[in-house]
């Protein structure tokens, strides 16, 4: 299938990456000042039947689309713009490790989030390859000759310092250099990305999220860690019983679950941003066994059951606790709300930037 991704935002979300990643992406502000209006998306290689002029290509899983990935995309966009060419990214869905490992892998971003973030980076064409055990048997030689050269007519390839692909991960940097000489395309290898002396990697970000260290995760992601989903009907006790109504989300098996407890949040609903607090856990006060994410949205009174929301996790407040009853729980939530509002007030500029969302004009 071929999709067209259109962006109608006012540009503030592009400033977020420039704001957080300016030390590692010195040209980022210039690139992001004129974001593309659309990105073409292919989910079937057979649908690619056009020639891409000056194809500058990168390949990766790009889970989280963190600052290291953004550095990679910036290089692709820079090279493509310089020659009037096309910036192309190739990625995979599901994540290869979800197919190849029995235990799978927990993902920082959904495929939907990944598409949005790659489009925001300025990429012109995104190829999403369905990853299967059959595709895993594809040799590196075949991948280069058939897809990169045969289908995309690659003119330049940009990869990360540790990238490898193909059966047995034989398509490493040395292999790609040899293939570039054979097929006459230059290879650019982007160095590892460090922020405050720490290597930026999806593995590290997953660890930080599991530990509830959202400030540290935000530095490496270049934005707040976000969960999203459709609001579910819960136990209906948040408003009537406790006095704090909640919008409830459920986790999928492949989702990365943050440390259980209470977080300060920003909630994006129907194009508007609100402050809030989020509890992730099992509701021990009421003896429940289902893992849920319950968000109380400040100064919000709409019925949003069945509607999508996005929740940015700003700061971990406290671990999940079992209280003596609803009154004790309500008293603690009241204290959580006061503290959360103060934290959001102290971060007002950052909150404004982080909550800027694409919207239909």
What are these regions (language model features)?
Residues 137-244, 320, 324-328, 341, ...:
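Classical nucleotidyltransferase
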Residues 49-111:
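N-terminal catalytic cores of NTP/NDP-binding nucleotidyl/phosphoryl-transfer enzymes
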Residues 234-361:
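Phosphate/ribose-recognition catalytic cores of enzymes acting on nucleotide-derived substrates
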Residues 34-55:
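Positively charged, low-complexity intrinsically disordered leader regions
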Residues 105-115, 138-144:
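Glycine-rich, highly charged phosphate/nucleotide-binding loops
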Residues 66, 118, 157, 217, ...:
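Residue-level signal for inorganic ion chemistry
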Residues 2, 13-15, 21-25, 30-32:
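Short terminal hydrophobic/aromatic SLiMs and anchors at protein ends
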